[in-house]
């Protein structure tokens, strides 16, 4: 069994890629695995993998991933695993992911800035080509951020800053998509500007930069171990199309928020009532189908035979003779079936089942 690895060319220049690969190589040595690096797409296209072989795809660029995953799926079927902060959006494709829990990270940072009194929060440095940043953007909007509060990096952090600077006074806090954007922002802002800045994704460079950056930190070397553990599930279960693993990050306060820690989590003193806004389930037709489905799903073979004979118009005596039950036993069972289906009589139950051509 062989584990193949292919990396996004641009992403290979990043420390994130190197850390993920280092973790994978460390696991290779410890577990004595066969790991083969694919230098380019041509090497992938000429590959004839064995039945249990797995491919790891390291990258985050949406266009690159689109093409690579299509090629990998044709060769490895469900044994394709993306390692990297990635937002799964290629519906219908059989591939799995190991990623940071981006939605949680953004939610933590957004709530943290709100706890500091930041009334309007910006998301800064979003790369339109990154599936990771697309996920951060979605999470930011779900937290209450607005589209107008998102500042995109179209290949120029200086240009991104110029756009923010025009609206700077409107914001009380800024979430940067990664430490590179956070460092750039701090360097461009005047020293007198003390706006709280946090980052979704750490880098080694920020460990040397001053002021230190508040943000979420994750061990990228853990991606490899998680990917190998995930591969075993896929190898043993051909009916499993995809598995997503979300790795936990840790919050690290820094000087960009005066070292203030996360606020203590509070438990509500009173029970909170959460009302569903999904009107799908309040549709009387859906409610009725759900009742029929629940009834049939809970039936034993004997119950189904009873219902079948009821629909055929047989008398209690005929049904009892066929099922070796007394008339009272049949009536008792029928009473339970009516209760389960929300009907009040044999006629109502038969009418309900006939609606859906049951049996």
Predicted segments with their positions:
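An alpha-beta-alpha
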Residues: 107-147, 243-259
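Alpha-helical recognition/docking segments in bacterial nutrient-uptake
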Residues: 1-111, 165-169, 173
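Short, Lys/Arg-enriched N-terminal segment that forms or immediately precedes the first helix
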Residues: 284-295
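Short, basic, alpha-helical segments at the C-terminal edge of helix-turn-helix-like DNA-binding modules
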Residues: 343-359
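Hydrophobic alpha-helical segments within soluble ligand-binding/sensing domains
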Residues: 87, 94-123, 157-162, 182, ...
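Short helix-coil-helix linker/hinge
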Residues: 296-303
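Recognition helix of helix-turn-helix DNA-binding domains
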Residues: 313-348
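Flexible loop/turn connectors
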Residues: 94-95, 166-173, 180-268
């Amino acid at each position: 069994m062989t584990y193949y690895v292919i990396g996004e060319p641009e992403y290979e220049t990043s420390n994130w890629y190197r850390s993920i690969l280092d973790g994978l190589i460390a696991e290779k040595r410890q577990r004595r695995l066969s790991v083969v690096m694919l230098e380019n797409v041509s090497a992938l296209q000429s590959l004839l993998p064995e039945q249990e072989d797995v491919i790891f795809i390291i990258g985050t660029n949406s266009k690159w991933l689109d093409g690579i995953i299509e090629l990998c799926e044709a060769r490895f079927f469900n044994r394709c695993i993306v390692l990297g902060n990635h937002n799964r959006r290629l519906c219908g494709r059989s591939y799995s992911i190991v990623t940071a829990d981006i939605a949680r990270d953004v939610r933590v940072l957004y709530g943290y800035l709100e706890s500091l009194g930041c009334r309007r929060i910006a998301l800064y440095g979003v790369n339109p080509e990154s599936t990771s940043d697309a996920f951060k953007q979605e999470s930011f909007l779900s937290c209450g951020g607005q589209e107008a509060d998102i500042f995109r990096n179209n290949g120029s952090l200086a240009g991104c800053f110029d756009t923010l600077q025009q609206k700077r006074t409107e914001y009380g806090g800024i979430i940067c998509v990664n430490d590179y954007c956070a460092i750039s922002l701090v360097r461009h802002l005047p020293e007198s500007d003390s706006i709280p800045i946090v980052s979704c994704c750490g880098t080694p460079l920020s460990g040397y930069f001053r002021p230190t950056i508040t943000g979420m930190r994750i061990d990228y070397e853990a991606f490899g171990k998680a990917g190998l553990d995930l591969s075993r599930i896929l190898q043993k279960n051909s009916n499993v199309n995809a598995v997503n693993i979300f790795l936990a990050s840790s919050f690290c306060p820094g000087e960009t928020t005066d070292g203030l820690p996360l606020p203590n989590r509070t438990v509500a003193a009173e029970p909170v009532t959460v009302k569903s806004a999904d009107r799908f389930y309040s549709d009387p037709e859906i409610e009725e189908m759900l009742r029929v489905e629940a009834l049939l799903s809970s039936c034993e073979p004997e119950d189904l035979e009873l219902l079948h004979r009821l629909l055929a118009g047989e008398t209690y005596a005929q049904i009892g003779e066929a099922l070796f039950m007394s008339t009272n036993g049949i009536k008792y069972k029928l009473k339970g079936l009516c209760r389960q289906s929300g009907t009040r009589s044999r006629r109502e139950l038969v009418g309900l089942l006939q609606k859906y051509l049951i049996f």
